[in-house]
Amino acid sequence: MRLLLIHSDYIEYEAKKKTKMAEEGAVLSDREEDALTVFTAVESVDEEDTEGVILQAIEEVKKTAGQVHAEKIVIYPYAHLSSDLARPELAVPALNALRDGLAAEGFAVKRAPFGWYKSFKISCKGHPLSELSKTIVPGEEGEVVSKKLGKKEATHDWFVMTPDGKTHDYHKYLDNTPFGCLVKKELGVAEPTGGEPAHVDLMRSKELVDYEPASDVGCMRWMPKGKLIRDLMADYVLALLLPYGATPVETPVMYDLGDKAIYEHADKFGERQYRFKSNNRDMMLRFAACFGMFSIMRDMHISKNTLPMKMYELSTYSFRHEQKGEVIGLKRLRCFTMPDMHSLCTDMPEAMKCFEEQLAIGWQTGRDFETKLVAAFRCTKKFYDENEAWVKKIVKESDCPMLIEILSERVHYWEAKIDLAAIDGQNRPIENPTVQIDVESSTRFNIKYFKDDGTPVYPPILHCSPTGSVERVICAILENISTQKVPALPTWLSPVQARVVPVAERHTAYAQEICDALNAQGIRCDLDERDESVGKKVREAGMDWVPYVIVIGDEEMASKKLTVTIRRKSEPNKPFKEQMTTDALAATIKNETAGKPFRPLYTPRKLSLKARYI
């Protein structure tokens, strides 16, 4: 922000002609005597910390007014102070906030209109402090925190609701159960924990994911085994949502902040954003798939009989400029993959019905990923008062206690939402699935359908991520595994589902036949034909968390039955072994992974050909 402060005998102006960005309802001519005139230019860089810039400007003007003993202030928008001006959508609220902030300090404040060609006359007093210029610069470049200028502050009430519909003081739940850990974190009473989360070591030691030093902090590189898990999760969500009626789309990762709807939605979100210049356009990298899907919906011809309409995108990638010190492992990233569904509903009752369906999908993903989920439901007081019976219904159907947060008024785009979270090894929540009822975006983005009489309706929109970001799901799975006596991935997500270990070279050909037969039946199976001891091969299979390990020796070749170590039935130092045929083993694994997606091996079938990545 640029300021030119003139201590004036008088300032008078008259608005002559509108520009295309002229504000309406302003005072078009005025005069003030013995005032501090503040010629002001709001710059594009001020978007990085608008609130901070305004607070600094208030202090600078207040300081100068005190030095020259001025009690009256005139704020005069003056574009000629800068060659890099902010958009009107930012500049006008910033000028109003500057005016209101100075008025709150006890000054008599006037503001000249924005976006008009004006004539003005000014008489400078001519003393040493009568002409001063100030440049106010925001914080770190590239990191934008939406300040939601002019937003209302809400009060928050908290309680716990149990499936019987009763409400309870949340203090009774401040324990170390998974739900208690969520309550403590949300209420700000969680004990501080130190050290690195368990999943960080596991993601690297198992050669799944690693940091990419040549990229920005919080951007990861995916090795073949991690890439396979990630792809299977994407397949899983698509297979889950297609039968539900979701229609897949793909949209850009960057958007023009000159679009008023996009700017307002970004500002509502309130998270750090990547913003940059493309020629003279202010752009941002998306933090979710809302922008692209809403743009598609805005251009569609929607009739009531096509609702509810569900649109899905695997947002690869989304971006949030998290603080460097907060970025860690897969839990908090700057670049991530988000399964994102938006449902356009006829009205609020239909939105609430879809909410129930999508919440059920969220709970199902927790079971399929073998992660224990706990819940926090949030809504406005108005929504709760009107729909208390429905809130009790979803708690009952979820069959678990929920932390309930009641906001005195709406400060976000949603009227109600639910967040499901896993708990990590340090008793901290990992937010994953979410469902939200958005009551603002259809109006903001001009998304509508028409009644039979031609009346337009701007309907509620549900935001749903049935899993949360893929990275956080993997984080939750690894954190859960870190607490197990015998760590094991869900078999359908295991990069290698079975491994064949020949005892000696003479057993290798038969072991190869078994390996090929299992792969032919849709089992990810590899062969450890290396010249190593059987003990070492079996130990390494355990370190790789292979669910089924088949040792082939003379007995197995003669009997045509396999000796299989089953990881999920084993205990520390007590491997569980079972004899079965090749077809029986394949049937066991297929039964265990029924209904889940399958992809073949992403690594060589022979261990002697596998490279080390970390």
Curated annotation (Swiss-Prot):
Zn(2+) binds at C290, H342, H463. GO terms for biological process: threonyl-tRNA aminoacylation. Residues 1-141 are annotated as: Editing domain. Disulfide bonds: none annotated. The lineage of its organism: Archaea, Methanobacteriati, Methanobacteriota, Stenosarchaea group, Methanomicrobia. Keywords: Aminoacyl-tRNA synthetase, ATP-binding, Cytoplasm, Ligase, Metal-binding, Nucleotide-binding, Protein biosynthesis, RNA-binding, tRNA-binding, Zinc. Binds 1 zinc ion per subunit. It catalyses: tRNA(Thr) + L-threonine + ATP = L-threonyl-tRNA(Thr) + AMP + diphosphate + H(+). The gene is thrS. Belongs to the class-II aminoacyl-tRNA synthetase family. Its EC number is 6.1.1.3. This is Threonine--tRNA ligase. GO terms for molecular function: ATP binding; threonine-tRNA ligase activity; tRNA binding; zinc ion binding. The N-terminal domain is an archaea-specific tRNA-editing domain that hydrolyzes incorrectly charged L-seryl-tRNA(Thr). Catalysis of tRNA editing is performed by the charged tRNA itself. It is found in: Cytoplasm. Catalyzes the attachment of threonine to tRNA(Thr) in a two-step reaction: L-threonine is first activated by ATP to form Thr-AMP and then transferred to the acceptor end of tRNA(Thr). Also edits incorrectly charged L-seryl-tRNA(Thr). Residues 198-490 are annotated as: Catalytic. InterPro entries: aa-tRNA-synt_IIb, aa-tRNA-synth_II, aa-tRNA-synth_II/BPL/LPL, Anticodon-bd, Anticodon-bd_dom_sf, DTD-like_sf, Thr-tRNA-ligase_IIa, Threonyl-tRNA_syn_edit_dom_arc. It is an enzyme of class 6 (ligase). GO terms for cellular component: cytoplasm. Its main location: cytoplasm. Homodimer. Its cofactor is Zn(2+). It holds the Pfam family tRNA-synt_2b. It comes from Methanoregula boonei (strain DSM 21154 / JCM 14090 / 6A8).
